[in-house]
Structure formats: C-alpha cells, structure tokens
Regions:
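A surface-exposed regulatory interaction patch that couples sensing to output
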Residues: 75-90, 94
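Short Asp/Glu-rich motifs
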Residues: 41-42, 77-78, 119
Length: 144
C-alpha cells in the first residue's frame, strides 16, 4: 500500500521524515539492512529517483550508511539515534504545547493535563509490578 503524502512539502522530505520515524521507533533497528531503493519506492508508491534522493539525505545526516555491494544499513551510533529521538520528540512536544496554548491553556494547565494522562499508565505499571512482587513473595513463602 502506497504511503500517504501531502502537498505541503516535497515528497522526498516527507519520505525522509517517515524513514526517520521508522528508525527512531525501532521499526528499522540499528545495524539492520534497509530494503533496496526499488523495493522502498514500490512500497511508498514513488519514483525510485525520489527514494534515492531521500536515502542520500539520510546518508548525509549519518543515520544510514551505504556499503558498496551490501546495501544501506541503519547506523549503530547510539548517540546519533538518541539525538534523532530527542529532536523528533522535541518537535512533537513543541507542536503539542503550541496547540494547547492555542486552546487558551496555561503552562500549568498543560503540565497537569499531561501528568493526568501519564499517571494512569504509571499507576497500572506499578500495580503490575507490585502484583508480580507479591506473587514471587508468596511463592517464596510457600517454599519455606
């Protein structure tokens, strides 16, 4: 199925951003081989030259390395991958803050809203960990 593109930015830049998201999320793990230009172009529904341009941009940024006869591989540079994840998360958070401020929310209200949304997951995780601890503790008591 072809990737979705919009008319607001050049397609090759949209491809770069999609591939960066896939790298940051681990869909393309560090050191993994990327599909060929032709295969990626078919998957995305774009001209191979457009895909080549996007991949060249990723090579220039250091996220992808080209090995002459073996293909292209995702970098294993942990710092580069952390920088990518941080810059992408910073951009997402900045956009979120701008949208929430646009709704008239103060920074304090934004922080509280985010805390409320994160808290249920944290509480659920703590409950799960406590349940596991209790089960292990009970098993240990039964053995003694």
């Amino acid at each position: 199925m072809a990737w979705k593109f919009n008319d607001n930015a050049p397609i090759y830049l949209q491809i770069v951003n999609t591939l960066k998201r896939n790298i940051a999320s681990g869909a393309y793990p560090p050191g993994s081989r990327l599909p060929s230009v032709r295969d990626l172009a078919l998957e995305a529904g774009v001209n191979p030259n457009t895909m080549q341009r996007a991949l060249s941009e990723l090579e220039r940024s250091g996220l992808v390395n080209s090995q002459r006869t073996a293909g292209r591989f995702i970098t294993e540079d942990a710092d580069a991958l952390l920088d990518l994840r941080k810059s992408m998360s910073d951009e997402i958070i900045s956009q979120l803050i701008a949208k929430l401020r646009g709704l008239g929310m103060s920074d304090e209200q934004i922080l509280e809203t985010v805390r409320e949304k994160i808290r249920p997951d944290t509480v659920r995780e703590n409950i799960s960990q406590n349940t596991i601890r209790d089960e292990i503790s009970n098993e240990h008591k039964e053995e003694t």
